[in-house]
Every structure is written in structure tokens, then in C-alpha cells.
Swiss-Prot record:
It is found in: Secreted. One of its GO terms (cellular component) is extracellular region. Belongs to the long (3 C-C) scorpion toxin superfamily. This is Toxin-like peptide AaF1CA7. Residues 1-22 form the signal peptide. It comes from Androctonus australis.
Amino acid sequence: MMKLMLFSIIVILFSLIGSIHGADVPGNYPLDSSDDTYLCAPLGENPSCIQICRKHGVKYGYCYAFQCWCEYFGR
């Protein structure tokens, strides 16, 4: 019985840890007027990507795989 209780506590703790970290933030690559993605460098937080994302109505974005990625952006 004690093993079952310990196992249950461990499962609950791991599920809480998973919910704290959560899933990846949804988003999308914004497209320009030619339906192309915006290219960028350097990778990571990038001022030009943040500016592009704001132009598309999103507060934050960054450079991922040399293309601007906007968090919480849906086409």
C-alpha cells in the first residue's frame, strides 16, 4: 500500500512539473506581400523580427531557422 501511495505522489509531481513548463508557445511565420517568409539573422531575439511581428499585430517574435517567428500569431 505504501508503494502505491509513493508511486501516486511521484506521478502527480511529474504531471505538475509538466503543466508548469507547458507546451511550446503557438505561433507562425509571418508572410510578406509576396507570400514569402521574412529572413533574419542572427538567430534568437532579433529586433527586426520583433518589429515585423508588431507590424502583423503580435507583441513578440524572434529569429528561428533564419526566418522570423511570431508567438501567438495565426494566419
